[in-house]
């Protein structure tokens, strides 16, 4: 077993946020892969709220969804910081960065 210190980047967005004609979470996932970042996962929330305090949740028969989405990316600090520089100005939502230990079995 090997334990390595990495950074976990979390970007909070929503299903309806877009950039360059595609959902913002897809843009982030594609950029992370292109830049060779170690791993990225997209989570769709059941419900949530942000700075507007408007609770967003799934509604039956709703044509457009605006559920919260979280993109998590893990890699070394320098690669994460470069990625953050690249997406600067493209998102005005919450972004968090924390230390994690990745365990390779």
From Swiss-Prot:
Transmembrane segments: none annotated. It comes from the Bacteria. Belongs to the UPF0166 family. This is UPF0166 protein aq_450. It comes from Aquifex aeolicus (strain VF5). The lineage of its organism: Bacteria, Pseudomonadati, Aquificota, Aquificia, Aquificales.
């Amino acid at each position: 077993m090997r334990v390595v210190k990495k950074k976990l980047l979390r970007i909070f967005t929503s299903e309806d946020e877009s950039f360059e004609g595609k959902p913002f979470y897809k843009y982030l996932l594609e950029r992370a892969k292109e830049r060779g970042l170690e791993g990225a996962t997209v989570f769709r929330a059941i419900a949530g709220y942000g700075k507007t305090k408007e609770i967003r949740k799934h509604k039956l028969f709703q044509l457009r969804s605006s559920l919260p989405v979280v993109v998590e990316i893990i890699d070394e600090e320098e690669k994460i910081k470069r990625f953050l520089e690249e997406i600067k100005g493209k998102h005005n939502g919450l972004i968090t960065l924390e230390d994690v230990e990745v365990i390779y079995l």
